[in-house]
C-alpha cells in the first residue's frame, strides 16, 4: 500500500525515505452540461421534413417545431393540416416595437412641420394682439371704476345689515339672560302662588278624595297653646264631628252604671 504524498515528503526531508513515488494522475473527463432544447430522437421518430426539429420550451414546458432555415415555428407538426407556421413571439414583439418607433418618428416629423406653420401664422397675429391689449386695458379701467362703486355700495349694505343683526342679537341675548335668571332662581317671587296651585295633589291627602280643605305643610302638627283634649282637629265635614274621645275610666264607669240600671229594673 503506497504512503500518502504528504507523509512521503516529510520522511524524505528527514532522510528516512529516499525514493518518492510519483502522484497518480487523475483522468479528467470533460462533459457537456449545456442543455440542448432540440429533441433529436423525437425528430427522427416523427420523420419531420428537412430543417425541421422538435424543440422543448422550458418556459411553458411544452414542445414546439422549429425550422432552422426560415426560423419559423409551429405548435403542431408540419405534417398536421391544422398547423400554423408563424414567427416566434419574441420576433413578433421586436418587429412590432420597430414599427411603433418608425410611426412615432413620422408623427414627430409631422408635428415639427405643424409647429413651423403655426409660428408663421403667429407673426401677423402679434399686431392684432397689441391692439386687443389696448382695448382690454381701457375695458379694465372702466370695469375697475364700476367695481369700486359696486364695492362701496356693497359695504354700505353690509354695514346696515350688520347693525340690524347686532340689534336683534342684543334683544335676543337680553331675553335669554332673563329666562336663565328665572330658571336659576330657587323660589321666584312672582310665581310662588302659581307654582303652589300647579303642584299635583297627593293621592293620600283627604282633600284629593273628599270635601276636606287642602292642608299646608304645618297642618296636623301640634300647636304650642292648644289643649290636649284628644279631639281630632283635622276631621271636618258632615261625616266627621269634632268631639273628644272618652278615657278608659269613663268607659268603665259608664258600663257599671248601665249594669246597675239593668239590675234595678
UniProtKB/Swiss-Prot annotation:
PANTHER family: POLYGLUTAMINE BINDING PROTEIN 1/MARVEL MEMBRANE-ASSOCIATING DOMAIN CONTAINING 3, POLYGLUTAMINE-BINDING PROTEIN 1. GO terms for cellular component: cytoplasm; nuclear speck. The modification Phosphoserine is found at residues 94, 247. The WW domain may play a role as a transcriptional activator directly or via association with the transcription machinery. The WW domain mediates interaction with WBP11, ATN1, SF3B1 and the C-terminal domain of the RNA polymerase II large subunit. Except for the WW domain, the protein is intrinsically disordered. Residues 150-163 are annotated as: 7 X 2 AA tandem repeats of [DE]-R. This is Polyglutamine-binding protein 1. It comes from Pongo pygmaeus. Residues 94-265 are annotated as: Disordered. Keywords: Immunity, Innate immunity, mRNA processing, mRNA splicing, Nucleus, Phosphoprotein, Repeat, Transcription, Transcription regulation. GO terms for biological process: activation of innate immune response; alternative mRNA splicing, via spliceosome; cellular response to exogenous dsRNA; defense response to virus; innate immune response; neuron projection development; positive regulation of defense response to virus by host; positive regulation of type I interferon production. Residues 139-144 are annotated as: 3 X 2 AA tandem repeats of [DE]-R. It is found in: Nucleus; Nucleus speckle; Cytoplasmic granule. SMART domains: WW. Residues 245-255 are annotated as: Important for interaction with TXNL4A. Residues 104-138 are annotated as: 5 X 7 AA approximate tandem repeats of D-R-[SG]-H-D-K-S. Gene3D superfamilies: 2.20.70.10, Glutaredoxin. Its main location: nucleus. Interacts with POU3F2/Brn-2, ATXN1, TXNL4A, HTT and AR. Interaction with ATXN1 correlates positively with the length of the polyglutamine tract. Interacts with RNA polymerase II large subunit in a phosphorylation-dependent manner. Forms a ternary complex with ATXN1 mutant and phosphorylated RNA polymerase II. Interacts (via C-terminus) with TXNL4A and CD2BP2. Interacts (via WW domain) with ATN1 and SF3B1, and may interact with additional splice factors. Interacts (via WW domain) with WBP11; Leading to reduce interaction between PQBP1 and TXNL4A. Interacts with CAPRIN1. Interacts with DDX1. Residues 99-175 have a biased composition (Basic and acidic residues).
Amino acid at each position: 500500500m503506497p504512503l500518502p504524498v504528504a507523509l512521503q515528503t516529510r520522511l524524505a526531508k528527514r532522510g528516512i525515505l529516499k525514493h518518492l513515488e510519483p502522484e497518480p494522475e487523475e483522468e479528467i473527463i470533460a462533459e457537456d452540461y449545456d442543455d440542448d432544447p432540440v429533441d433529436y430522437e423525437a425528430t427522427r421518430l416523427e420523420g419531420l421534413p428537412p430543417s425541421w426539429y422538435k424543440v422543448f420550451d422550458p418556459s411553458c414546458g411544452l414542445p414546439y417545431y422549429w425550422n432552422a432555415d426560415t426560423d419559423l415555428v409551429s405548435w403542431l407538426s408540419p405534417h398536421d393540416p391544422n398547423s400554423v407556421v408563424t414567427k416566434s413571439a419574441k420576433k413578433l414583439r421586436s418587429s412590432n416595437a420597430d414599427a411603433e418607433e418608425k410611426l412615432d418618428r413620422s408623427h414627430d416629423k409631422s408635428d415639427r412641420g405643424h409647429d413651423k406653420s403655426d409660428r408663421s401664422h403667429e407673426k401677423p397675429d402679434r399686431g392684432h394682439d397689441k391692439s386687443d391689449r389696448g382695448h382690454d386695458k381701457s375695458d379694465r379701467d372702466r370695469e375697475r371704476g364700476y367695481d369700486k362703486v359696486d364695492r362701496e355700495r356693497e359695504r354700505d349694505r353690509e354695514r346696515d345689515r350688520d347693525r340690524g343683526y347686532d340689534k336683534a342679537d342684543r334683544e335676543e341675548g337680553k331675553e335669554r339672560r332673563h329666562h336663565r335668571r328665572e330658571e336659576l332662581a330657587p323660589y321666584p317671587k312672582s310665581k310662588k302662588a302659581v307654582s303652589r296651585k300647579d303642584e299635583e295633589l297627593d293621592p293620600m291627602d283627604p282633600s284629593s278624595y273628599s270635601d276636606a280643605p287642602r292642608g299646608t305643610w304645618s297642618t296636623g302638627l301640634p300647636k304650642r297653646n292648644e289643649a290636649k283634649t284628644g279631639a281630632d282637629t283635622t276631621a271636618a265635614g258632615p261625616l266627621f264631628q269634632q268631639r273628644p274621645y272618652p278615657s278608659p275610666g269613663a268607659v268603665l264607669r259608664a258600663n257599671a252604671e248601665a249594669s246597675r240600671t239593668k239590675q234595678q229594673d
